[in-house]
Every structure is written in structure tokens, then in C-alpha cells.
């Protein structure tokens, strides 16, 4: 399960997700990827499930990059507990995702294999996604870094 090694604060506020992603919104390492089209929280278990789905489909071919990291703790109070008496303890970690954020990247496989692997991964995620290629970003005029 992905989680930070150390954090400054054990509990954080929920916050709000407005606007589009300003960083991580282009393909930096691979040739293909999936990009979020809506905002949401993705838990570390969902990231791991998507990673396993990709790796199972591509088998030993290709390399996969996970471009998001769950750095936000989500607290929960125990079941059947009365209101009050402080905030609950951290239960799991989430990555805050905004529209435009590239979640996973893959290279070393054909486009059809990458498209199917990303489709399987997107079924494990709670946000809507779309398949993107490095060509898409080069056509838009943005320079794409070689990873």
C-alpha cells in the first residue's frame, strides 16, 4: 500500500477540488497513458489494483509509471460512535486528482496492448479517464520532456 514515510501533520482538512490540474498533465516518461477527466480522490488500494491490472495484461513487456501518490490522510471514526470527542484517526491515504492529470504511463508495448491495459486499469479507478498518447501532446504544441 502506498503511503508517505513521514508527514508533517497526521490529520489534514478535506479541502476542495476546483480547477484543472496544473502539474502532471502531460506524458513525461512513457508513450501512452490515462488522463483523468474529472476530479476525485483515488485511494492507495485503488492505485495498487490498477497497477496490478496493467501488469497482468502486459505481462513482462513494457514499463509502467505511476504518476500519482497518495499523500492525503483520510480519517474515520469507529462505527456506532457518538458525535464529538475529537476527529477520528487516519484510516487510509488518498491522492487528490483534478481533470487533466495523467495517472499512469506505459511504454515498450504496442498501442492496442496499451489501450486495453489502460481500459482495464480505468475500471479500477473512481474517476472518469481517457486514453492519451505522446502524439496528442506534441500536436497540441506543448513540449514533452524525455524521461
Curated annotation (Swiss-Prot):
InterPro entries registered for this protein in UniProt: Ribosomal_uL16, Ribosomal_uL16_bact-type, Ribosomal_uL16_CS, Ribosomal_uL16_dom, Ribosomal_uL16_sf
Disulfide partners: none
One MF annotation (Gene Ontology) recorded for this entry: rRNA binding
SUPFAM superfamilies assigned to the protein according to its UniProt record, in alphabetical order: Ribosomal protein L16p/L10e
Keyword entries, A-Z: Ribonucleoprotein, Ribosomal protein, RNA-binding, rRNA-binding, tRNA-binding
One BP annotation, GO: translation
Gene Ontology CC: one annotated term: cytosolic large ribosomal subunit
Pfam families in UniProt: Ribosomal_L16
Domain of life: Bacteria
Gene3D superfamilies in the record: Ribosomal protein L10e/L16
Annotated function: Binds 23S rRNA and is also seen to make contacts with the A and possibly P site tRNAs.
Subunit description: Part of the 50S ribosomal subunit.
Family: Belongs to the universal ribosomal protein uL16 family.
Protein name: Large ribosomal subunit protein uL16
Species this protein is from: Clostridium botulinum (strain Hall / ATCC 3502 / NCTC 13319 / Type A)
Gene for this chain: rplP
Amino acid at each position: 500500500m502506498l503511503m508517505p514515510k513521514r508527514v508533517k501533520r497526521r490529520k489534514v482538512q478535506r479541502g476542495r477540488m476546483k480547477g484543472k490540474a496544473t502539474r502532471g498533465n502531460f506524458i513525461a516518461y512513457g508513450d501512452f497513458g490515462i488522463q483523468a477527466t474529472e476530479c476525485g480522490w483515488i485511494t492507495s488500494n485503488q492505485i495498487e489494483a490498477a497497477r496490478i491490472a496493467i501488469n497482468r495484461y502486459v505481462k513482462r513487456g513494457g514499463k509502467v509509471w505511476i504518476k500519482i501518490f497518495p499523500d492525503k490522510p483520510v480519517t474515520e471514526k469507529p462505527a456506532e460512535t457518538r458525535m464529538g470527542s475529537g476527529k477520528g484517526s487516519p484510516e487510509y491515504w488518498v491522492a487528490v486528482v483534478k481533470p487533466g492529470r495523467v495517472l499512469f504511463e506505459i511504454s515498450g508495448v504496442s498501442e492496442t496492448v496499451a489501450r486495453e491495459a489502460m481500459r482495464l486499469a480505468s475500471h479500477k479507478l473512481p474517476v472518469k479517464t481517457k486514453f492519451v498518447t505522446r502524439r496528442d501532446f506534441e500536436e497540441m504544441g506543448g513540449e514533452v520532456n524525455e524521461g
